[in-house]
């Protein structure tokens, strides 16, 4: 007869032999709990549906009270997990999930389900449910117990847990920013104040004393502690760095009003220090720097644009950084690239403390020109465990700085150069970085898209210089809103360059479309990985890059010249295999909505088809055509909305996709000079969110001059036009604010269309296909 006590004993014995249990680091309870909070949460957790219920085991970590483990056991492996996981009384997984659903209201819960009576034939499942969520996910290897330390580490480094904690940190950054604003701390000093508190909190004497000191005494103690901690560093600029913190002693509120400075330090310890301890080598200060400057009146004057942490980590993987890498960032900022590089190198060092010391003292080199940011960088590196003695204050173009860096023989360059610098173009910073690297080393940099698109002028000369001396290995087009949190409207590309090896003739550079990193914007908390997509996306990107895979709609290899556009959008093919009737139906519905709003009649029964014949979309038999071979392209004539006379007769079509481009309705009589003839396709040529889209205008209209143009063809009617709009919209990913749909880019854009027996566009098929879809009778 099955005996559940046998199953329980396997786990009990395992825990009683665990180091955490022996060292008294946990509270181990069976089928009950003395913890008031846990007991209250389980008061209605009976598997029978009423009253209290307890799992077989509950484990609490004394130093991590927000995390608990619950364990549920069944003797027979056939009762391990039900299909729908809703038979709580009979199945191990189901029961564990029930308890977790109650406990996760206040705790992060690791639930372990165990079944079986034979030690070598146990079934073991692990799931993690985070506090305040109703979702859980599988974690750890199935059918194996792990040491409690591994369970704790796995929980602390779980991607979803990190995202949750990071969101809490960002929320706190907003609260802290508001508090510092109230306390009249200037935006440019806020990050320094936080970094100073974090440095001082490393000192045991300061930690023990700061809560009991008067404001003036505390300000003095804070500055002195920072000085004592940083003076160990062999850096000739250390006195300048310490001087940066002197504002704390003279600040009217911080140094005089009771508890203000103390409360800031206390909250920094609780919210930021704990995060840094858990997630080592993450540029936490950089995130606060971004937040503090987000609402500043003059953020560009105050500082720089910081690369998001998931991208700094991506750079390290692109560059294959390991324990022997020597990394230089000549535009260091707050040190995000160096911190990510240090993390990768230390992981690769595998616990070798001597090697770790060498990494921090000799293999991390940074250069920063701005004084306040240099101070912040040094502090940031201290917080993350040294690595600060090789930070150089100055310009990366100074000969003295160049010679100093070369002594270290760097073999990896990582940088995000200043955008729009008055003295030097972005590619100049990259060429400068390349001169510092050993031959065959890699430089990975992120630059405005305009730098890689240049066909004329100084930037073209820089592109020529780059190919004459180095190899352009890869270029990746990055998400349009990557720097949204920094309030910077710039479309960027990442370039990968092999140093000091001339670009070989006929060598194919790899181009990748890396526009979707899985991050989304929220008004209250900015751009983040809310849906935990980034890990898989990054894995796919890196695999494709390392294997140089050419994937339709994602990547392509191309032999390039300096005057070419160095971006995937110029060369990648559109993936027509994803085209379905839904794409066409949406265009039809959008056009009908536009007709209603622009005062046009919509007849027939809503949703009806004009014919019931079924047509297939066999895109393999279609042929490519240039846009200029299909359309006669003309400019639109509209002016700004301020000069137009409003009315109800004629639509003003702007650079937008929604509502068929409709911006406003105008009077026809008083705007004659701006009117374009209807029955045409309108190409939206500019605009961060709409460049590359098209609309169909059945009647005369006013188009936004300079941002739209129109295409005419005698075969065009409203049915085949909507077919064409659907096809043309597939080209949208190739265009953006940084790469407009103008000139030859528009004329030479290739689209794939059905053809007739003479290999010409099959206008009749396009018309008939639209007529076979719902709502076609309402057109």
Language-model-detected regions and their locations in the chain:
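Non-catalytic DNA-recognition/assembly elements of restriction-modification systems
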Residues: 554-638, 643-660, 757-779
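Nucleic-acid nuclease catalytic cores
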Residues: 83-134
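A short beta-sheet element
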Residues: 664-726
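Long recognition/docking surfaces used for binding and targeting
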Residues: 195-296
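Conserved S-adenosyl-L-methionine
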Residues: 302-420, 427-428, 435, 448-449
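Active-site metal-binding core of divalent-cation-utilizing nuclease and nuclease-like domains
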Residues: 25-67
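A conserved structural/catalytic subdomain of Rossmann-like adenosyl-cofactor enzymes
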Residues: 62, 77-79, 84-87, 100, ...
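A short glycine-rich beta-alpha junction/loop motif
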Residues: 495, 702-709, 738-759
């Amino acid at each position: 007869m099955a005996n559940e006590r046998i199953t329980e004993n396997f786990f009990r014995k395992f825990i009683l032999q665990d180091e955490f249990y022996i060292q008294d680091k946990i509270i181990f309870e069976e089928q009950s709990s003395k913890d008031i909070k846990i007991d209250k949460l389980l008061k209605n957790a009976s598997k029978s549906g009423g009253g209290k219920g307890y799992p077989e085991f509950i484990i609490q970590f004394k130093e991590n009270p927000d995390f608990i483990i619950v364990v549920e056991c069944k003797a027979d492996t056939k009762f391990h997990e039900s299909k729908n996981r809703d038979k709580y009384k009979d199945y191990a997984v189901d029961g564990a999930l029930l308890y977790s659903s109650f406990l996760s209201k206040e705790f992060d819960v690791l639930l372990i389900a165990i079944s079986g009576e034979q030690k070598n034939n146990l079934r073991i499942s692990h799931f993690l449910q985070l506090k305040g969520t109703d979702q859980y996910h599988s974690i750890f290897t199935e059918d194996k117990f792990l040491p409690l330390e591994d369970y704790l580490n796995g929980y602390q480094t779980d991607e979803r847990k990190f995202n949750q904690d990071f969101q809490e940190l960002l929320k706190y950054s907003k609260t802290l920013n508001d508090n510092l604003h109230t306390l009249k701390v200037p935006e440019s000093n806020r990050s320094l104040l936080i970094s100073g508190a974090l440095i001082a909190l490393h000192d045991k004497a300061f930690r023990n004393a700061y809560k009991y000191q008067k404001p003036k005494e505390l300000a003095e103690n804070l500055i002195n502690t920072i000085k004592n901690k940083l003076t160990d560093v062999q850096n000739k600029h250390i006195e300048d760095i310490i001087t940066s913190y002197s504002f704390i002693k003279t600040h009217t509120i911080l140094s005089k009003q009771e508890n203000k400075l103390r409360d800031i330090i206390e909250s920094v310890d609780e919210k930021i220090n704990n995060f840094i301890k858990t997630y080592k080598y993450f540029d936490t200060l950089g995130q606060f720097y971004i937040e503090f400057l987000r609402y500043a009146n003059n953020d560009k004057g105050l500082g720089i644009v910081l690369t998001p942490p998931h991208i700094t980590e991506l750079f390290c993987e692109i560059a294959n950084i390991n324990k022997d890498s020597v990394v230089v960032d000549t535009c260091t900022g707050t040190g995000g690239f160096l911190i990510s590089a240090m993390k990768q190198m230390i992981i690769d060092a595998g616990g070798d403390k001597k090697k770790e010391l060498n990494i921090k003292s000799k293999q991390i080199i940074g250069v920063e020109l701005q004084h306040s940011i240099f101070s912040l960088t040094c502090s940031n590196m201290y917080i993350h465990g040294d690595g600060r003695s090789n930070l150089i204050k100055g310009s990366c173009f100074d000969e003295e700085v160049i010679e100093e860096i070369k002594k270290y023989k760097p073999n990896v360059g990582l940088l995000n150069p200043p955008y729009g610098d008055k003295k030097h173009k972005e590619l100049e910073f990259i060429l400068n970085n390349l001169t510092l690297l050993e031959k065959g080393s890699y430089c990975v940099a992120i630059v405005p898209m305009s730098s890689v698109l240049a066909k004329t002028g100084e930037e073209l000369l820089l592109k020529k210089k780059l190919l004459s001396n180095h190899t352009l290995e890869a270029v990746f087009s990055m998400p349009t809103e990557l720097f949204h949190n920094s309030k910077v409207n710039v479309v960027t590309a990442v370039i990968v360059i092999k140093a000091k090896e001339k670009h070989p003739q006929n060598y194919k550079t790899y181009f990748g479309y890396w526009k979707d990193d899985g991050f989304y914007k929220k008004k209250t908390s900015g751009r983040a990985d809310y849906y935990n997509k980034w890990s898989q996306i990054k894995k796919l990107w890196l695999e494709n890059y390392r294997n140089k895979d050419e994937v339709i709609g994602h990547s392509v290899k191309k032999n390039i010249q300096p005057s070419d556009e160095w971006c995937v959008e110029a060369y990648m093919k559109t993936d027509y295999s994803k085209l379905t009737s839904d794409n066409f139906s949406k265009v039809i519905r959008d056009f009908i909505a536009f007709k209603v709003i622009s005062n046009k009649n919509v007849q027939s029964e809503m949703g009806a088809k004009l014919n019931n014949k079924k047509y297939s979309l066999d895109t393999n038999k279609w042929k490519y055509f240039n846009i200029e071979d299909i359309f006669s392209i003309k400019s639109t004539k509209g002016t700004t909305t301020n000069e137009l006379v409003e009315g109800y007769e004629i639509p003003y079509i702007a650079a937008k996709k929604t509502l068929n481009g409709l911006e406003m309705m105008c009077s026809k009589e008083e705007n004659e000079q701006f009117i374009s003839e209807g029955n045409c396709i309108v190409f939206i040529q500019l605009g961060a969110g709409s460049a590359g889209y098209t609309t169909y205008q059945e009647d005369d209209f006013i188009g936004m001059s300079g941002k739209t143009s129109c295409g005419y063809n005698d075969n065009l009617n409203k049915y085949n036009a909507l077919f064409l709009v659907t096809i043309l919209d597939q080209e949208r990913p190739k265009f953006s604010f940084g790469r407009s749909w103008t000139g030859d880019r528009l004329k030479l854009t290739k689209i794939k269309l059905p053809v007739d027996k003479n290999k010409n566009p099959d206008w009749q098929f396009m018309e008939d296909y639209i007529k076979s879809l719902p709502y076609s009778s309402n057109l």
